[in-house]
């Protein structure tokens, strides 16, 4: 290709050079500010997601038949989260995040009366939780597991629904519902997930470096209490407790409950070390406050779902019982100002670690390596590599 210049000489077009990394972007047109519409740093909003027990219960409504139907649909949605957690091999904290987001959605917007529409919303919530908490799964995995759940748990669908048609319906609505849910939440993905927070607050580093000076008898008992606390949260999140307290309060609630159970069943002299909660959580822990939360928790169980995981009479915990396992006494005047930051940089900036922590990491790495080797050997045993047939001699 060529072009004629004004002087009549024929010159060839030269290739346009590619801009370097230092090239400045083209000037924006007047009235358009790219930084306003798409800033370098997007700050997600944070809303208040803690409500009064009275308001949570009243949200069900006073119309008996409608309230029963709503609770029935809600229970199916919670069952859906648990079933897909098993089928898709999701983490516990993804399951708890799904339940937390579901209750927030229900409290603000309510849920449809049709169960299929409820599952549509639940599927969008599950995908959002999965993307927020861990690696996402292929869209086919969500669709297949969701449709199987519907066919197994809603008998009326079996006779009048084509499974392939159902899959296409859920595929079409998945992305739409996911966008809808994000917009309705105002992109507020600050889940304050207690199952995730407890792993961070009591991670290996803090256990071996921050908590090394705890009493030996407590250090032996605490891993068992911590495990029971994890189980407590996974079970408790099926009731709308996440609307009653934030993530850190939820963790303290579980540790107090499991500490009382340990005191009753194992060691009658058990007690958390002095200011154990004050030094680790950014909240004020008092017996009176948490006794009220346990009372509200019991009311939620009575008004919502009758589940096997319900604690029932075990939630009748008063302030004197809580006071018997915690020792948060201190300077009342400075109590608020001394509330701890669980991720205080001052505790870790030196970079020094205990030898026990290094040994712990080495043991964990070896365990993971051995596990990977065993799984690899199992796969090879199930699918042995076929040896190629011997070449036949040419005739």
From Swiss-Prot:
Q: Which GO terms describe its molecular function?
A: cyclin-dependent protein serine/threonine kinase activator activity; cyclin-dependent protein serine/threonine kinase regulator activity
Q: Give its localization.
A: Nucleus
Q: Which InterPro entries match?
A: Cyclin-like_sf
Source organism, top-level taxon: Eukaryota
Positions carrying Phosphoserine: 24
Listed GO cellular component terms? Answer: cyclin-dependent protein kinase holoenzyme complex; cyclin/CDK positive transcription elongation factor complex; nucleus
Q: Biological process GO annotation list?
A: DNA-templated transcription; DNA-templated transcription termination; positive regulation of DNA-templated transcription, elongation; positive regulation of transcription by RNA polymerase II; sno(s)RNA transcription; transcription elongation by RNA polymerase II
Q: Which UniProt keywords apply?
A: Cell cycle, Nucleus, Phosphoprotein, Transcription, Transcription regulation
According to the record, the residues making up region (Disordered) are: 1-31, 372-395
Protein function: Component of the BUR kinase complex involved in transcription regulation. This complex phosphorylates 'Ser-120' of the UBC2/RAD6 ubiquitin-conjugating enzyme (E2), leading to monoubiquitination of histone H2B, the localization of the PAF1 complex to the chromatin, and the silencing of telomeric-associated genes. Also required for histone H3 'Lys-4' trimethylation. May phosphorylate the 'Ser-5' of the RBP1 carboxy-terminal domain (CTD) repeats. Necessary for the recovery from pheromone-induced growth arrest in the cell cycle G1 phase. Also required for vegetative growth itself.
Q: What else is known?
A: Present with 2910 molecules/cell in log phase SD medium.
The entry describes its oligomerization and partners as: Belongs to the BUR kinase complex composed of SGV1/BUR1 and BUR2. Interacts with SGV1.
What's this protein's name? Answer: Protein BUR2
Q: What is the lineage of its organism?
A: Eukaryota, Fungi, Dikarya, Ascomycota, Saccharomycotina
The encoding gene is: BUR2
């Amino acid at each position: 290709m060529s072009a004629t210049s004004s002087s009549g000489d024929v010159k060839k077009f030269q290739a346009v050079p590619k801009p370097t990394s230092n090239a400045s972007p083209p000037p924006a047109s007047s009235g358009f500010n790219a930084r306003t519409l798409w800033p370098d740093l997007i700050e997600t909003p944070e809303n208040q997601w803690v409500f009064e027990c009275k308001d949570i219960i009243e949200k069900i409504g006073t119309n008996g038949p409608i309230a029963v139907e709503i609770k029935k649909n809600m229970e199916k949605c919670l069952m859906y989260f648990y079933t897909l957690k098993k089928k898709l091999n999701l983490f516990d904290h993804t399951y708890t995040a799904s339940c937390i987001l579901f209750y927030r959605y229900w409290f603000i917007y309510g849920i449809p009366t049709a169960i299929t529409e409820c599952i549509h919303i639940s599927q969008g919530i599950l995908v959002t939780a999965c993307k927020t908490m861990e690696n996402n799964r292929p869209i086919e995995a969500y669709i297949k597991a969701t449709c199987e759940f519907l066919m197994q748990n809603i008998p009326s669908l079996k006779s009048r629904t084509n499974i392939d048609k159902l899959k296409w319906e859920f595929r079409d609505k998945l992305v739409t519902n996911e966008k809808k849910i994000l917009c309705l939440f105002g992109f507020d993905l600050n889940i304050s997930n207690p199952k995730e927070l407890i792993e961070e607050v009591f991670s290996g580093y803090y256990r071996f470096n921050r908590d090394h000076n705890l009493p030996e008898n407590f250090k032996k008992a605490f891993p068992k209490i911590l495990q029971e606390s994890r189980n407590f949260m996974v079970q408790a999140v099926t009731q709308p407790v996440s609307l009653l307290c934030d993530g850190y309060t939820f963790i303290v609630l579980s540790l107090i409950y499991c500490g009382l159970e340990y005191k009753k069943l194992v060691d009658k002299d058990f007690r958390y070390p002095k200011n154990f909660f004050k030094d680790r959580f950014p909240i004020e822990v008092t017996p009176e406050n948490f006794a009220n939360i346990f009372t509200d928790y019991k009311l939620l169980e009575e008004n919502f779902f009758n589940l096997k995981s319900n604690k029932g009479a075990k939630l009748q915990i008063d302030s004197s019982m809580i006071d018997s396992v915690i020792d948060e006494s201190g300077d009342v005047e400075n109590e608020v100002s001394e509330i701890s930051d669980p991720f205080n940089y001052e505790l870790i900036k030196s970079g020094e670690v205990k030898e026990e922590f290094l040994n712990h990491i080495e043991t964990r790495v070896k365990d993971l390596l051995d596990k990977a080797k065993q799984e690899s050997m199992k796969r090879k045993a199930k699918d042995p590599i076929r040896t190629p047939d011997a070449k036949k001699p040419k005739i």
